[in-house]
Amino acid sequence: MGFLEEEGRWNLSFSGAGYLGAHHVGATECLRQRAPRLLQGARRIYGSSSGALNAVSIVCGKSVDFCCSHLLGMVGQLERLSLSILHPAYAPIEHVKQQLQDALPPDAHVLASQRLGISLTRWPDGRNFLVTDFATCDELIQALVCTLYFPFYCGLIPPEFRGERYIDGALSNNLPFADCPSTITVSPFHGTVDICPQSTSPNLHELNVFNFSFQISTENFFLGLICLIPPSLEVVADNCRQGYLDALRFLERRGLTKEPVLWTLVSKEPPAPADGNWDAGCDQRWKGGLSLNWKVPHVQVKDVPNFEQLSPELEAALKKACTRDPSRWARFWHSGPGQVLTYLLLPCTLPFEYIYFRSRRLVVWLPDVPADLWWMQGLLRNMALEVFSRTKAQLLGPISPPATRVLETSPLQPQIAPHREELGPTHQA
């Protein structure tokens, strides 16, 4: 199997996905159940944005129940806010940072060093950095906070890491080492990634940006909206199930599973191989020495009547994470009349909520105020110096000689020779 034959010769790379990071959770659970060697023997696991969260959960050995409960728990909190991401209580960076401080083990930086790679984008020049060494657990958490920080969506002041400001790593390198043949890439968007949904539309147009290639389609457009504004818990849970199916298709196409599971899900018999081997009919197209069986079908979540038979652990974790408060009060506020009453009371409740949550965020920000103000002062000073230097260069630049006016003459008229002054000695009569 090429580079998969020797342990430690392949990498895993997870793209930025926002709330669609649930796709990474499902794909990881499929690899853990059906091909654990791909996770255990990986040389390094890269990630940008929410993909870095999935990568650190793999390195630290977190269970699928842990990942689903934390990710879908955040979606549930957002679902309860009347204005969704516009509500003043919405603070994704603070929430994730607190969850990481509570959940990561004290030696997480030791486990992550030299095995985890986090993509960061330096502000303001946009240069990409891959961080692979972490001195403390707090430094690891700060690197994760930086790669999750999407400008304006998460705030106005970028977080600091090792004396410099960084933002979302997906804005400069969304899929680290995607061009390397020995890297297994994972993404929830339709495209040419190893583990990704297969588009049902015949659109062949692709967009390559930020070291990432994806198809230009309506499916990807709506997936991009779900990344930032998840509509419901069920939609995110289905995306997690789709990640499991996409990873299973990846394994079956490369002959890394014992039996063709996807054929049974679509109620079809697998094509009978000519020589009696499951690897027959493979297309010998290489990416690091892997043969691909393109006859493996693409299965969507709606095609699976009972997902629990496919992965009981993942389905149990998703059902547990999607469970809402069963009380009558909670059910009333989720009903139609409750939603109408919520919006009718917004003019009365929103000002108090705004003052409360903004004041609380200000208290949390107080320890970082001196450093942030100093950074903003330096940023404004550099911008002013840049504007001054450009203005000075334009006003006091070298004076160019006046342009020579060329007179075009008709071919029927004699050309007027330019006047030249003779500097030689004068002739006497």
UniProtKB/Swiss-Prot annotation:
Q: Where is this motif: GXGXXG?
A: 16-21
The record ties this protein, via Pfam families, to: Patatin (PF01734)
GO-annotated molecular function: triacylglycerol lipase activity
List this protein's GO terms for biological process.
Answer: lipid homeostasis; triglyceride catabolic process
Report the superkingdom from the record.
Answer: Eukaryota
Q: Which residues form the active site?
A: S49 (nucleophile), D168 (proton acceptor)
EC numbers for this chain = 3.1.1.3
Q: Which UniProt keywords apply?
A: Hydrolase, Lipid degradation, Lipid metabolism
Record motif GXSXG, residues: 47-51
GO cellular component, alphabetical, reads: cytoplasm; cytosol; lipid droplet; membrane
UniProt cross-references to InterPro entries, sorted A to Z? Acyl_Trfase/lysoPLipase, PLPL, PNPLA_dom
- Where in this protein would one find the motif DGA/G, according to its record? 168-170
Organ and tissue specificity: Expressed in brain and pituitary gland.
SUPFAM superfamilies this protein is in? Answer: FabD/lysophospholipase-like
Please give the function described in this protein's UniProt entry.
Has abundant triacylglycerol lipase activity.
Q: What PANTHER family does the record point to? A: CALCIUM-INDEPENDENT PHOSPHOLIPASE A2 IPLA2 -RELATED (PTHR12406), PATATIN-LIKE PHOSPHOLIPASE DOMAIN-CONTAINING PROTEIN 5 (PTHR12406:SF4)
Q: Would you tell me the protein name for this molecule?
A: Patatin-like phospholipase domain-containing protein 5
Originating gene: PNPLA5
